[in-house]
Regions:
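Proline- and acidic/polar-enriched loop/turn elements at helix boundaries
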Residues: 43-44, 61
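Amphipathic alpha-helical dimerization/coiled-coil segments
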Residues: 79-109
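Short, hydrophobic-biased segments on the C-terminal half of alpha helices
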Residues: 46-49
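Generic recognition of well-ordered alpha-helical segments
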Residues: 29, 74, 89-92
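Basic, amphipathic "hinge/linker" alpha-helix immediately C-terminal to the N-terminal HTH DNA-binding motif
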Residues: 62-84
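Short beta-strand "wing" residues that participate in macromolecule-binding interfaces
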Residues: 57
Length: 109
């Protein structure tokens, strides 16, 4: 598995929260398919995105206590749109290098 940059982590969190209002532990679980991210890594990201105005929080009762939920803001949605554009460009550049390498190996083999 490849290391996840801070920007990619932000993009992934914003994307998950854009799908549904959700809470930290669920975000961690949802991210496990793509990245090994612990709660201790995720919560500072959530706090930073909240402080920057990309996310907002609210509490919802759950089993007799409050659970903190996150929702994306208009600013967060705009950031996510840009992250998606940047990701497609970056992914295309990486794909072109990886595919070129595979073709070169087959040609030389």
């Amino acid at each position: 598995m490849f290391p996840i940059s801070a920007a990619l982590l932000d993009a992934m969190v914003l994307s998950l929260v854009a799908r549904e209002e959700t809470y930290g532990y669920k975000i961690t679980q949802d991210m496990q398919t793509a990245a090994k991210v612990s709660e201790s890594t995720l919560y500072p990201v959530l706090r930073r995105l909240q402080k920057n105005g990309a996310l907002e929080t609210f509490d919802r009762a759950y089993m007799g206590r409050n659970r903190r939920y996150y929702r994306i803001t208009a600013l967060g949605a705009a950031m996510l749109r840009q992250y998606r554009i940047d990701w497609e460009e970056h992914k295309g550049q990486i794909d072109s290098i990886l595919k070129e390498k595979e073709e070169t190996q087959h040609d030389n083999g």
